[in-house]
């Protein structure tokens, strides 16, 4: 499971159009567009289809600082161990981790993703989760969960049932602290992109970002 450091929240729009949004860490507020989670290093991670395992690429070993490559390798080792123990499959095209063959595991509008409900899908990656929203109704539904008293537990149960992978306890706990902010940010981003479908990335340190697809 993911749970690298104490939860923080960093929010940004798609990389081509980043926005400054308040970041709260230990009751302090700053301004930042940095996303220091491991997902920014995904380009240096490759899939070994024969072993059904993730590997740090030779380029990553060469160009990344030792502290970064060590952290990535540690996360890959943990993820690979879970994949092997539970017979998960890595989709070599998307790097998503699935319970069934990516060639038979599909969902409307988001091929290969697991369905949470109509219009809302999720993919599990080595660095965290990606939530897809293909309708305004799905956004409203997800925000409704975020507004509940047990938002983290509810989302954690839905994700675990859909992907077979349990969210880290720190992530579930962080939902309780940042659910209102996430709900508001999701609403605002979706409102700005009414003509597009949106998705939200959530990494292991509870940094989340919104994008269109």
Per-region residue spans from a language model:
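Short hydrophobic membrane-inserting alpha-helices and related fusion/pore-forming segments
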Residues: 150-173
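N-terminal propeptides/leader regions of secreted preproproteins
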Residues: 8-120
